Each structure stands twice: as structure tokens, then as C-alpha cells.
Amino acid sequence: RKIILKQNKTLKDCLENTIIPDLFKEGVNFLKWKDLKESEQEQVSQHFRVSILPILTPLAVDYGHPFPFISNLSKSLGISLLKPNSGEKIFSRVKIPDEISQWETVREDKNGVSFINLEEILVNNLHFLFPGTEIVDKMIFRVTRNIDLEEEDEYAEDLKEVIEEGLREKKFSPVIRLEVEDNSENWISNYISSELELSGEDVYEMSSLANYTSFGEITKINRPKLKYKSWTPRIHSDFVDEKANIFNKIKSKDIFVHHPYESFNHSVERFIETAAHDPKVYAIKITLYRTTINSKIIDSLVYAAQNGKQ
């Protein structure tokens, strides 16, 4: 717990005291709602009503609606509301969508470009989501579920079956951590903790719940000066001929490929793709640590599985 909190503080300090100030000097700005002009607030609110509001689903908890399921590592907005008639405080949850852009461009001119984060847009436009209802407070939070395999499962006779079952069940595995913002309103945090049966040790007040990977969107702006030159790997001499049978190449000799200096696409990806389409291949066994979002290897493995290969 201490290590995680320390790491989070280090990341936040690096972002807020180094990266963001350095980008500001280069004309790349990150704005809060209060930084926007009135016309800009209306522009962003219009974007919210047209493009974001239709995909949001608020789930309020009352006698007829139980506490909603919250998926692993998804960020949510917890909101405390007052019922119009009784004045009773109730909880509502809105999942923060990750399928859409996390950054909205507010200004872009010769002086630079300014962005506002999706979460900042959400918390300042909740009145469109809950018209006529008093919003008492709101809090961004995230849960972590236990998706580890049990130790005895690692030695099961059919590990493939265990993994498949684990993947099905992990969605509903127990929550082991609740992350909330620093100085979050206690009622919301306590309510969520109670519903998820968490103790105080399971609740982490984080200095930032920022999704640091979302900053990858910012790299798409046209600022060559701020980017490293793209790396173009060379193609290994044995794989230059794309029509040559890769299995024949491997049969003739061992081939050593050095990544990232030599192309992964023309070697490993090509090897897996060829295996997936070759009728003489009955099984593909590979250990993948992680893949990119649009991985050609995953596409090849899916194709192989759909065509009866193990």
C-alpha cells in the first residue's frame, strides 16, 4: 500500500511539475472548466449534449434498483443526489466511457493548442444528466478486482480449461481495492465501500486517478519538434522476399532476429500469420505477455482457432 501511494505521488509530481509546465512552454495547455471563457464553456457543453450525453447511463440506487456492477479498472463518477420530494440522499453511478476521446480541443491557433479532459467536462455538465435534481456532491473512483489464478490452478491438469474459466469468471471476481480522489466526500466513499464490503485498508486516497495512457492522444498533434523521430526497423535479409516460404527458411537454418532494430512485422508476425493459414499446421503454441490494440498476431490466432487449430 505504501509503495503504491508513493509511486502515484511520484507520477503526479512528474506530470504536474515537469511534463505539463514543459508542454505549456511549447504552447500545449491543459485547462480546467474555470479556465474557459463563457463562449468556450457553451461550446464544450454543446459537444457534451450531442456526443457524450447519449452514451451515458446513470444508475441510481434505490429500493427497486440494486448497487450496479462495476467492472475492473473502469473509472466511474459517483454522485450523491437529493430526491426531490423526500430530500433523501441517494447514490448514482455513471461510468466514464473509454471508447471516446478523453481530451477535447478547446482552442487551437498560432499560439498553441488547449485541451480539456473528459472528466472535467462530465463533472461540470451533470445538470444535463440529472435535470431538476439537486446534486450534493460527486467523486471519481475506480475499483480493482482480483483476477489472479489460485496457486493450485497453476498446476491443474488442463491449464487451458482453467485459463478459459478464469477469463469468464474474472469479470465478477471480488473487489480488492477502491481508489478515490484525495479529500473525497466521505458519504460517497463510505457508501461504495459498504456496498463492496471493503475495509479502510482497501480504500486508497490517490492524489490523481489520471489515466496516464490517455495522454497518448495528445501526441497526435502536429508538433514534430516535440517528438522523437519515428524508428523504421530494417528487414532481416532472410525475410526480404515476402513470397518465400518462411518455413523453408527456418528449416534451412536458425535465424536470429534482433528487435526492435529488425522488423517484428516481417519476422514473428509473418511467421504466426503463415502458421495460421497453413493447412499442415495443427497447433500454435505461444506465450504472449501483451499485445497492441490492433495486433496482427491476435488476428492470426483468432483465424487459426476459427479454422480448427489448437
Predicted segments, located by residue:
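N-terminal localization/anchoring segments of enzymes in phospholipid and broader phosphate metabolism
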Residues: 1-310
